[in-house]
Amino acid sequence: MAFRIEHLADCPEHLARVAAWQHTEFGYLNPSIRLEQREERLRASLSATGLPLTLVAVSDDGDPIGAATLLPRTITHPHLTPWLSTVVVPPACRGQGIASALSLRIALEAARLGFPMVYLFTPHNASLYRRAGWETVEMAELNGAPVTIMVRSTSV
């Protein structure tokens, strides 16, 4: 499947769908966050000039098929910055390199903003990120769920 990666600021019509995907995929990690709050957080990334920054993978037909956000910090490790967050690809679109392409583009965006490294945590996709050049930093817990903290250089 052919796709391009755009800043959410350039395709804000996809904001509600991306928020719904994030809520469905990651809501269990922080159940107190409502869908409306996710939408509000995404609205903060409608400027492509700094953080937060959200990227959307868009098919040639114009449909969103994945998204990822670059955040300045995370609740578990506020001393590390920035963070690749909420990478989500709908089940029907998985296995086509979309998540890997999004994570690479996030690293490039972090480099553009002057960051030498970018971090992430993942509850269940560490092997996918290892194949894309990420290294494990440590194992941690987020609201009782085990997560892998990973890092990669932004010089790709």
Whereabouts are the PLM-identified features?
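Conserved N-terminal entry element of GNAT/NAT acetyltransferase domains
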Residues: 1-17, 156
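Conserved acetyl-CoA-binding loop-helix of GNAT-fold acetyltransferases
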Residues: 86-89, 95-108
